[in-house]
């Protein structure tokens, strides 16, 4: 968009109550989507790391461990979809319950908690920690992310 168009929009926006807030919310929503897409990508990379470890288990014919890791990989795959496709921090334009900027900031705080757990999962899948510790760490983080996503979704539903 050219500077001329921005200036026109800014001038028009100055005449419309709440325009700036709406613009900021739109920017935050775009950031939120990008943020979640990046985190989903980290989870996908973590899953690929687990798949590489599973190949080692297959070559050593350790089917019991392979099944345990497959369960964890499936949980990770499901969580990737939940993170990627979770509710946006938005409400419809004409809804009686519009999400305000400070409430949208709370949604972003949920996202920050999620990213902390995702980074732990990625580092655990990438590092050569003990196998049992890695499984426990990833499993616990997945449970925490599920809880946070549920709380986040409940919070957003208040404004739909």
Predicted features by range, described:
Residues 1-58:
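Leu/Val/Ala/Ile-rich N-terminal alpha-helices, chiefly Sec-type signal peptides and the beginnings
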Residues 2-3, 148-160:
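Short acidic DE-rich linear segments
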